[in-house]
């Protein structure tokens, strides 16, 4: 088959990392004759990655986009130009299917509309699915109606778990829906690095001090680093012999630094580390990781932490309770429960959960699923693909 991948993101987050692994899976597929990858030239890291793939693999063709989703946001004329030029390109490629990387249903819309105008079958790779209007305001209701229309545009969806798949069946009942579980590098579960060695390499004390880490894009709306800081300030005694590492970069980095600098309580225990290309030493050095997000797909750091046999405390959102036991979950927005879970997490047994994650999130499983979702659909558009990963029975025991 002759297939394509479209990504107009200007950032490189977890979804873009999984997209790179998706590309590699398709390159190894004997059923894929040509893989056309459309990426923005201004996303230097992603563009360079795809350029290298094309240089080393004869079946890969790169198409450079002159825009990113961020550069055309709020500019209808720029959006129309992007749709028209991309649709013209798609007509020349003669694709049997185009995978469109969408962080949410309103991202990647230039590719979605272009596929519709070019009459190319569109597969939305969607890690986040909306629940409904945020408030009862007229503005939010109108936005929700617009989103409902957009959920009806893709011919197919691939998402991350059964919880999200169920929501898509409601919003897009006539589209085929499939599951593609994330995976992470085997080194997280095979590393010989010890906690003491990791702490020594990072200049962290190994004297009984508790080390807690938050790893992710610094974005208060989603990742809620501000909530973590609020929890520390509300429970200063609990964090007296604790170091809290915040690893990452993002739009709210300056606000985060200002909050820490303005508070003696936070200054005493919080260390803003910044972005790191290799987070494994920070995971291994930690007693507990935290992810108090407002919304998530299936966060890679959750998988990485569990594979490294480190507990991670996450908010009970978006079906994440199907991955972790109750002892590692807390009600979103509950500071007290969050802190309680953090300091109890060290006693949560991880071996069985790690073994389950190692099986569930393997490269072999991911590649087989990735290759399958790009094949021509055998059901009609009104049916959903019944094939899905077997759910873990570990949490039911």
Locations of the language-model features?
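A conserved mid-protein helix/loop that constitutes part of the nucleotide-sugar donor-binding site
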Residues: 13-24, 210, 217-234, 251-254
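An aromatic- and histidine-rich active-site surface loop
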Residues: 45, 79-82, 98-118
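Nucleotide-activated donor-binding/catalytic signature segment of Leloir-type glycosyltransferases, i.e.
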Residues: 56-61, 257-274
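Conserved acidic donor-binding segment of nucleotide-sugar-dependent glycosyltransferases
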Residues: 325-336, 342-347
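Aromatic "clamp/platform" in nucleotide-sugar-dependent glycosyltransferases that forms part
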Residues: 103, 275, 294
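A short helix/loop element that forms part of the nucleotide-sugar donor recognition site in Leloir-type
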Residues: 189-205, 352
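Short hydrophobic beta-strand element within catalytic cores of glycosyltransferases
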Residues: 302, 311-314
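Carbohydrate-associated surface elements
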Residues: 163, 183
């Amino acid at each position: 088959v002759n297939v394509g991948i479209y990504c107009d993101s200007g950032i490189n987050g977890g979804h873009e990392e999984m997209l790179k692994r998706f590309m590699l899976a398709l390159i190894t597929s004997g059923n894929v004759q040509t893989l056309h990858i459309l990426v923005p030239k201004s996303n230097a890291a992603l563009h360079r990655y795809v350029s290298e793939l094309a240089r080393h693999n004869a079946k890969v063709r790169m198409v450079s986009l002159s825009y990113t989703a961020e550069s055309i946001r709020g500019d209808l004329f720029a959006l129309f130009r992007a749709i028209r030029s991309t649709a013209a390109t798609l007509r020349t490629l003669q694709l049997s299917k185009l995978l469109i990387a969408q962080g949410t249903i309103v991202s990647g819309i230039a590719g979605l509309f272009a596929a519709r105008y070019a009459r190319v079958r569109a597969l939305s790779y969607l890690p986040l699915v909306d629940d409904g209007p945020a408030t009862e305001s007229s503005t939010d209701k109108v936005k929700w109606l617009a989103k409902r229309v957009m959920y009806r545009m893709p011919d197919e969806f691939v998402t991350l778990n059964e919880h999200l798949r169920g929501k898509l069946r409601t919003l897009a009942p006539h589209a085929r829906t499939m599951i593609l579980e994330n995976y992470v590098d085997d080194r997280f579960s095979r590393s010989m690095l010890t906690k003491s060695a990791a702490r020594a390499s990072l200049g962290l004390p190994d004297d009984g001090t508790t080390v807690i880490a938050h790893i992710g894009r610094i974005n208060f709306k989603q990742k809620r680093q501000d909530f973590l800081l609020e929890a520390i300030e509300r429970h200063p005694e609990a964090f007296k012999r604790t170091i809290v590492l915040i690893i990452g970069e993002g739009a709210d980095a300056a606000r985060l630094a200002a909050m820490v600098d303005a508070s003696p309580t936070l200054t005493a225990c919080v260390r803003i580390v910044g972005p790191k290309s290799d987070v494994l030493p920070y995971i291994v050095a930690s007693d507990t990781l935290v992810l108090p997000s407002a919304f998530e797909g299936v966060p890679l750091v959750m998988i990485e932490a569990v594979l490294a046999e480190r507990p991670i405390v996450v908010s009970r959102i978006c079906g994440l309770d199907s991955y972790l036991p109750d002892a590692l979950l807390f009600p979103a927005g509950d500071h007290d429960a969050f802190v309680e879970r953090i300091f109890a997490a060290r006693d949560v047994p991880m071996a069985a959960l790690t073994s389950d994650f190692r099986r569930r999130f393997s490269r072999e499983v991911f590649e087989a699923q990735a290759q399958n979702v790009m094949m021509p659909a055998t059901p009609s558009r009104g049916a959903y693909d019944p094939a899905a990963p077997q759910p873990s029975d570990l949490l039911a025991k």
